[in-house]
Amino acid sequence: TTEYPWNGDIKIAVKKSGVKNASLLVRIPGWVRNQVVPSDLYKYSDAEKPAYSVTVNGKAVEADLNANKGYLPVKNIKKGDVIRIHFDMPVRTVVANAKVADDNDKIAVERGPLVYCAEAVDNSNEPVLHAVMPEKPSFTLVDNYSIQNTETKGAPAFTVKAIVTSPAHIIYQKKEDVVAVDCTPLTLIPYYAWNHRGANQMNVWFYQGLSFMDK
């Protein structure tokens, strides 16, 4: 049983085991091991160090993940065993490899395995493509944030765990060399959940701080 990916608690109850000395390989995801993807394309830019735990009937199970290609072997499972897995799930910030020029000086936001985005419909129709994150953003989780699908008649609303940021900057181009800056928190939703509510702006990669305007 689990509510993953909304939280990091997973319970596996062994109802029966037809194989003697059976083993279970528990995948410890890359994001738990501070690896956004299995390459240097992206990396985390914060100082978070998510912890994880795996227990069998309350007893901790440990192993060298590198030796097991990211899997933690749980050996000799039997009927009646209860395996509990926990992953810390802080909100993380991600940067791209410097060779990805379009993403230089920008961050993305991730929680667990989910990438988040800002959609204008959740942010008073502000131009989220011009949103700039603070130098040191903070994040607040919002449970059961409702998204009503307006693109498909009769489609039910669905809920997600949203993220609200500390006040971000919205940049408005007033004249050729004149800009206005407004400060407002941003509401972020999981990337998979966007584009259900009509045409509007969406952004994943945000400039961080206003120093980019000097370049």
Regions found by a protein language model. Give the residues of each.
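C-terminal beta-rich recognition modules with glycine/proline-rich loops and embedded aromatic residues
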Residues: 1-13, 36-56, 65-72, 86-215
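Non-cytosolic beta-sheet module surface loops
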Residues: 2, 14-18, 28-30
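Surface-exposed beta-strand/loop patches in extracellular or lumenal glycoproteins
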Residues: 20-45
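Short, flexible loop/turn segments at beta-strand junctions in immunoglobulin-like
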Residues: 74-76
